[in-house]
């Protein structure tokens, strides 16, 4: 918690050339590249990627649907699915969906 508070205090100090919302794979890379010659603020609503199951490929089974690392979104019911709604896992952690997908492409 102290690290998060420290990060928030640093974020509130000054102006930024770029603000990137979402620290998934693309957001992290974009912030890194933009900050080479400018200032960039990277915002992420989720927490640290310190959950053991995000480090093990088979761990995606324990990540998807887990409110600690997944937003828990569902699709709208679809007629072609007999009115069912499907789970739509989205990463709520640094690294985004790449942290919870078990390295599956």
Segments predicted by a language model, with ranges:
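N-terminal redox-cofactor-binding region of secreted/periplasmic oxidoreductases
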Residues: 1-105
């Amino acid at each position: 918690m102290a690290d998060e508070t420290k990060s928030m205090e640093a974020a509130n100090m000054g102006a930024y050339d770029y603000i990137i919302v979402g620290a998934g794979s693309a957001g992290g890379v974009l912030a890194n590249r933009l900050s080479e010659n400018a200032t960039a603020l990277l915002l992420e609503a989720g927490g640290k990627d310190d959950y053991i199951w995000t480090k093990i490929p088979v761990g995606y089974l324990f990540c998807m649907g887990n409110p600690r690392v997944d937003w828990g979104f569902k699709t709208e019911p679809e007629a072609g699915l007999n009115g069912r709604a499907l789970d739509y896992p989205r990463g709520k952690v640094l690294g985004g969906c790449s942290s919870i997908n078990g390295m599956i492409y």
